[in-house]
Regions:
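Conserved ATP-binding/catalytic motifs of P-loop helicase motor domains
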Residues: 1-177
Length: 177
């Protein structure tokens, strides 16, 4: 997809993200979620308004590092101060894509803030690892959205193996022969 090599389940996840207003992409560490973010952003195209964010500062910095794209915390993107109950006047009128990484840590308030802000032309993609930490605030966002039937792609294939792990795997396979 636009110069990014994707496996079949990743291509299906990109299609899901680009054809639904709200979608979930779930998978464990190393399954290619960061690669998917780059592919989705490339498909939407340069010059279009996008917001990439994560629930915590550390997660936002990791998102930037893994994708090479600018990212913020959800609170910052929404113009929220974590200790206050108001939204600053942030305009998302032309935003066409919102990507939230580490969505398992989102609170209901964060999700509500995002869904309240997005215009009709916008797609919202929530990525997360169902085995990761849950939000310390209110809600169980990913399980709740799954229960509501929000379209979801599940990534099972691990793409991140270092040489040592691969050598160990080959030794196990050779041993069984």
């Amino acid at each position: 997809v636009n110069g990014i090599a994707l496996c079949q389940e990743q291509r299906a996840a990109v299609e899901l993200a680009l054809t639904n207003k709200l979608s979930l992409i779930l998978g464990g560490a190393g399954c290619g979620k960061s690669t998917l973010i780059r592919a989705i952003v490339n498909m939407v195209g340069a010059g279009h308004s996008m917001v990439l964010c994560a629930p915590t500062g550390k997660a936002a910095r990791n998102l930037e590092k893994r994708t090479g794209l600018s990212a913020r915390t959800v609170h910052s993107a929404l113009g929220m101060h974590p200790d206050e109950d108001f939204l600053a006047p942030v305009t998302w009128n032309t935003t066409q894509l919102v990507v939230v990484d580490e969505a398992s840590m989102m609170t209901l308030e964060m999700l509500a803030g995002i869904l309240h802000r997005v215009p009709k032309i916008c797609r919202v993609v929530l990525l997360g690892d169902p085995n990761q930490l849950l939000s310390v605030g209110s809600g169980n966002v990913l399980p709740d959205l799954l229960a509501l039937g929000v379209p979801c792609a599940r990534l099972e294939l691990n793409h991140r193996q270092d040489d040592e792990a691969e050598a160990l795997l080959h030794n196990v396979v050779d041993f069984k022969k």
